[in-house]
Amino acid sequence: MRTALTIAGSDSSGGAGIQADIKTMISNGVYAMSAITALTAQNTTGVTGIMEVTPEFLGEQLDNIFTDIYPDAVKIGMVSSSDLITKIADKLKEYDAKNIVVDPVMVATSGARLISEEAIDALKSCLLPMATVLTPNIPEAEVLAGMKIQSQADMIRAAEEIGTKYHCAVLCKGGHQLNDANDLLWRDGGYKWFYGEWIDNPNTHGTGCTLSSAIASNLAKEYDLDESVERAKKYISGALAAMLDLGKGSGPMNHGFAIKNEYTESKVEE
């Protein structure tokens, strides 16, 4: 069985972060492992608390994973401090990690920065050059490329700028900012559009985590990058189309929409 590792924060509501990553990886047919960067207290209405692990403990988690069940792919989500980012980069180099998918979580949809400038600098210098593919949304791509993105042409220019600078592939996600579900993959000097169905579902908590984890899962299964993106987009469309409605705010998707067997059935009252 192929294996995948997620390095990210825990979401107590289960919709994003480590929990979304593990659900996604299992649903995409790989064995999921995790190294937790932080615990969060949150639900569908917001985050009320964050407790980071120490760099030493994060390193210990990664040592235990890589020396026993070596991951065929690695997904990296939100890491909020430069010390943690540096520790991750050091361990990925030490163990010669492969198929590294970086979701550079830096900016909220509102435009507010989620991590410090010091952490962003560490992300740029340590982690991004190690990536197989980056999966920024529009605000994140604007930060990395140093330009505003208001059109598909801007997405192409930004992805090329980022990919050329960090020597990796870039999947620039359209999403809500451009009011479509079309994503741009830039790599090796060329680009390809992946067109998706826009699904009118307000419950989109964890979509970025889910997409990057699905890509990592498919890379672990030896699909090439184009195929991995295509399959990941199809999976996330299914999870959104299942129209799960939980919580008082922007709720989670149904990551297990395709899993149906005798163990998933609810009890029927006679």
Tell what function each PLM region has.
Residues 2-6, 26-109:
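Conserved N-terminal subdomain of the carbohydrate kinase-like
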Residues 19, 142-143, 201-225:
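Short, small-residue alpha-helix embedded
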Residues 29-33, 192, 218-232:
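Phosphate-handling active-site elements
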